[in-house]
Amino acid sequence: MTQIKICGLMRPADVVMVNQALPDAIGMVFAPGRRRRITMATARQLSQQLDPRIRRVGVFTTNQLSEILALVQQHIIQVVQLHATVDDPRIASLMAAHVPVIQAMTPANATQCQADYLLLDNARPGSGQVLDWNQLQSQRPVRPFILAGGLTPTNIVTAINKVYPAMVDVASGVETAGNKDREKINLMVQRAHQTGVSTPLLTEIRRN
């Protein structure tokens, strides 16, 4: 089994789909300028409708630390995913506040990850661009990691069998015409859960 996160939920209809498929986590995007960005009010609505077995991750870039902490303190999100510089001071601040942090990195700088969890992605997150899995095989991190970058129902099994991630993270790969697709979500969750033998991540995060 490989865990899976469905990223970029925007609508109540998206929550209905993931509640049926039961991925291990979902992502809500708060990063400025991103197509899938949602407001705190929308995120609160979605989180209240979400099955409590699914972990809630907030995705950030240049957001202020105060905004991130507010989302955690109001129980809208449980985990913070940061796309920022390697030495971003917010990582230490969040960890000091006992907030679980996922740090998004390219494979080239993965060894510099300072956060609780490592996510490997390409330089343009959410673009659907596929990572070079053959290259990643020779650069595979020692620690468990999350794999993102161009994953689809068609290539997910190959990706898992090549690089053995603990979790996969998908956004555009479960969309049709820019919206979440029920059939693709179901396929992705089913295939991820049926493939791989990895150490699960995020299991110790308290549900609230």
From Swiss-Prot:
One of its GO terms (biological process) is L-tryptophan biosynthetic process. Its EC number is 5.3.1.24. CDD domains: PRAI (cd00405). It comes from the Bacteria. Pfam families: PRAI. It is an enzyme of class 5 (isomerase). The keyword Isomerase applies. It catalyses: N-(5-phospho-beta-D-ribosyl)anthranilate = 1-(2-carboxyphenylamino)-1-deoxy-D-ribulose 5-phosphate. Pathway: Amino-acid biosynthesis; L-tryptophan biosynthesis; L-tryptophan from chorismate: step 3/5. Belongs to the TrpF family. This is N-(5'-phosphoribosyl)anthranilate isomerase. The gene is trpF.
